[in-house]
Swiss-Prot record:
It comes from Ehrlichia ruminantium (strain Gardel). Gene3D superfamilies: 2.20.25.10. This is UPF0434 protein ERGA_CDS_01260. Belongs to the UPF0434 family. It comes from the Bacteria. GO terms for cellular component: cytosol. The lineage of its organism: Bacteria, Pseudomonadati, Pseudomonadota, Alphaproteobacteria, Rickettsiales.
Amino acid sequence: MIDKKLLEILVCPLTKEKLEYNKDTNELISQKAKLAFPIRNGIPIMLVDEARKLE
């Protein structure tokens, strides 16, 4: 789970677009960049190198 206020201010580091939270995978999704950023121990990992590519 991610804090709603944090989700409101976080953006994709590549596109600067808002992110969507996927509770099933515990990731922040950037639709435009087609990347999923992991959340580990409650901390969003906003590094492109750590993101999973979406198909």
